[in-house]
Every structure is written in C-alpha cells, then in structure tokens.
Amino acid sequence: MKEVIAYKNDLEDYIYKLRDKINSEKAKGLFNDKEKENLVEEMDKVMQWLYSNDEDLYNIHKLEEKSKNMKKLGDIFLSKLYDWDGIKQYLTKMETLLYEKLAYFASMEEQIKRGEKKDMTIETINKINEYIQKEFNNFEAKMYEIDIADKTKEPKINVNDIENMINIFNDNINKMEKGQK
C-alpha cells in the first residue's frame, strides 16, 4: 500500500510541475496549440483518475503504466524546453565571454601603449580583436537564427555545438596570445 501511495504522489507531483512548466514564460511558443491542448487534456485525465474511486488506483501495475505513459508525453515537452533554454544559456555565456575578451585585450593594448607590457605587440592585439569581431558576427548570426526559429521544431543547433564553439574560441585566443596562430 505504501508503494501505491508513493506512486500516486509521485505522479501527481510530476503533473503539477509539468503544468507549471507548460505555463511558464520559457515555454511560450514551444508547442503549437494542438500539442499543448493534447498534453493538458492527458494531464487532466490522469489527475481525474488519481482522484477517482477507480479500484485500479490500488493496482501498482496500472499506476506504473499510467505514470510511464504520462512521463513519456511530458518528457517530450520537457526535453524541448530544456534544449531551447540550454541553447539560450550557452549563447549568453558565449556573449559574456566575447565581451570579457574585448575588454581584456583593450586593457592589454593600453598597457602596451604605456610600455608596461612587452611580451605582446599591438599587431597581435589587432589580430586578436579582428578574430573576436569575426566571432561576434558569428555569434550574432546564431542568436538571430535562434530568435527567429520555429520553437515548435527541434533546434538546428544544440548546447554541445555552442560549448564546442566556446572551447575552440578559447583555444584560438590562447594560441594567438602566445603567438602561435
């Protein structure tokens, strides 16, 4: 009986959290009306069943089946939500990195001009700044793609792609700074 109650509570909790996420600001535009309507309808049916007097409520196998089916539907939604949200977070991380590098190398340029930094040249700083600007243009193009993308479809870029962009960017900056590129 404890297992049945735990399953019921888990399923109910899952549905409440899923409903909150469906109605969140981050979820706007992720699903077309029909998809959202179908998901909400299924959640409502399961919640009604959980509060009914159906004897199957005490059948652990029926509860497992309902839970599995509900989570399968909900996880499709959550996966899409996390994909799009993750992309935005990593693009923001990339943007921050680009601004930080611009500021850092502007500071380095000033140090070179004042004669405080002798291990780097203005030419190197200029090459690095050109590279950063090129990456800024790439970044802005990616942001534009994401902003205009149909959020009801799978993203054309994923978090791993952006993470790789960040790593390659950092590697290239480090090489340029050391005069290797």
What do the predicted segments below correspond to?
Residues 1-181:
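PAZ/PAZ-like end-binding module
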